[in-house]
């Protein structure tokens, strides 16, 4: 039995209920296979430390994930805003560059063949160590990513909200949201491991 859905925003409740039910069915199938000594039908498993949902409000579609990290907000803030540290947990071996840690600053990697910017994120808001907001630059769809850092139980709750899916074709939207929800979960696990000095669960990055 899993409860607590009444605490979610009303517009997110149903979207959380449906995938949670399917997730528990898969988890039970894994338990059954493990007890029987058989191969797990869903080897990727599920991470209880992560919390997230997708929501639609005022025609704005977003994915949201969060994780608790045993470190102060200042430490987590550096991990998500310092290009050298981003490289360590996001894309080991691929150097990130930041023009300036200020509104309008650009965070990006260089195309190894042409030298052009790739995966550019433009800083929209910076409020250390509480909130960090970026927007993807053209030619990418203008998604806005918000990082919120909250003190919790002597550590930090890091929450990522990725919005802008309403700009995508309707037939692609939910599939992209599902894939990105999984991807942001992986990303948060890597941040958690990096900050706490653990082995990265996804050492190849993203």
Outline where the language-model segments fall.
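Short, highly charged C-terminal tails/helix-capping segments
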Residues: 33-57, 193-206
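Glycine-rich portal/gate segments that line the openings of hydrophobic small-molecule binding cavities
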Residues: 96-137
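A short, structured loop/turn motif at beta-sheet edges
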Residues: 73-74, 124-129, 148-157
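Beta-strand/loop substructures that line and gate deep hydrophobic ligand-binding cavities in soluble
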Residues: 1-26, 137-186
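Generic structural detector for well-ordered beta-strands
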Residues: 66-70, 108-110, 122, 148
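Hydrophobic ligand-binding cavity/cleft-lining segments
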Residues: 50-96
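Short, surface-exposed coil-to-beta transition loops
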Residues: 62-64, 116-120, 141-146
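Hydrophobic pocket/interface hotspot
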Residues: 24-27, 31, 76-80, 86, ...
């Amino acid at each position: 039995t899993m409860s607590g859905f009444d605490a979610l925003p009303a517009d997110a409740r149903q979207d959380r209920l449906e995938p949670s039910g399917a997730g528990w069915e898969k988890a039970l199938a894994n338990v059954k296979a493990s007890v029987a000594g058989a191969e797990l039908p869903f080897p990727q498993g599920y991470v209880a430390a992560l919390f997230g949902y997708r929501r639609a409000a005022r025609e704005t579609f977003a994915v949201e994930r969060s994780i608790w990290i045993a470190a102060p907000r200042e430490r987590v803030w550096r991990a998500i805003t310092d290009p050298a540290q981003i490289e360590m947990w996001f894309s080991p071996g691929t150097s990130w560059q930041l023009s300036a840690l200020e509104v309008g600053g650009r965070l990006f990697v260089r195309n190894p063949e042409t030298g052009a910017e790739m995966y550019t994120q433009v800083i929209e808001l910076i409020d250390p160590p509480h909130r960090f907001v970026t927007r993807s630059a053209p030619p990418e769809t203008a998604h806005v990513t918000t990082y919120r850092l909250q003190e919790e139980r002597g550590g930090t709750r890091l929450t990522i909200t990725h919005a802008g899916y309403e700009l995508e074709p309707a037939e692609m939207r939910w599939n992209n949201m599902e894939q990105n929800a999984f991807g942001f979960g992986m990303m948060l696990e890597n941040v958690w491991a990096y900050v706490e000095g653990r082995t990265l669960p996804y050492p190849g990055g993203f």
